[in-house]
Amino acid sequence: MYKRQIERAQQILCLLKEMSEEGSLPKDAKVFLDSPMAKKVTNVYKKWSELLSKHCQKFKNHPFEFPQLKLVKDVEESKKINDIERGCVIIAGSGMCTGGRILHHFKHRIWNPRNTVLFVGYQAKGTLGRKIIEGEKYIRIYHEDIIVKSKIVTINGFSAHADQKELISWMQEFDKLDRIFLIHGEYDKQVIFKSVIKNIMDKKAHIVEMKEKIYI
C-alpha cells in the first residue's frame, strides 16, 4: 500500500485499528508501517492524542496501536518483510512512488499476481504511481524492468483537498470576488472547473500558466 507520511498514514492506521477491534482484520495478519517519517509523525500524533478527531478517540486504547501492527525499525528489518509469504499489509512511501521504501517492495512484489497494490492518494502525471494506475505493463526500478502483474486498486476517498462543490461554497462566502485564478490541478480539470464557476457563480476564472506573471 502506498501512502503519504503525514495524516494519510495515520488515517489508515486508525481504520485498521477499527477493523482489528471489529474482527474484520484477521488476528494473525501482520501490518507493517515501513516509513521512518510516518513513524515519527505517528509518535507526534500519539503525544497529542487528545486533539484527535472524535472518531479516533472512541477506541478503548490508543488509535495507532493494535496487535497486528509492527513499526519497522530500519532498512534491514524492512528487507526481512520480503521473506513473508502469507498475507500482510505493508504501508510505505514515498508519496507518488518516486522514491523511498515502496520501490523496494515493488521490486519484490509487484510482479506477483497474488499481491494487491492499493493507492490511497492522487498520482501526478509523469510519476511512477501514475504510470502504474494507468496500466503500465513494465516499470523501471533500480535500473531493472519489472513486470506489473499485481492487482492495482485506487481509493479516492482519502483526499485532503476540497472537492468542486466545497470550493464553490467557499468562494460564495466572499462578499466581493473580482478575480479568480486557478493555479492548482491538471489542466483538463481546471477547464471543467472554470466552466462550473461561470455557470454557478457567473464569474470568470483565469487558468494560470507556468511562469505567467499576474499583476494585481
Predicted features, each with a name:
Residues 3-216:
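Acidic/His-rich, metal-assisted hydrolase cores and their charged scaffolds
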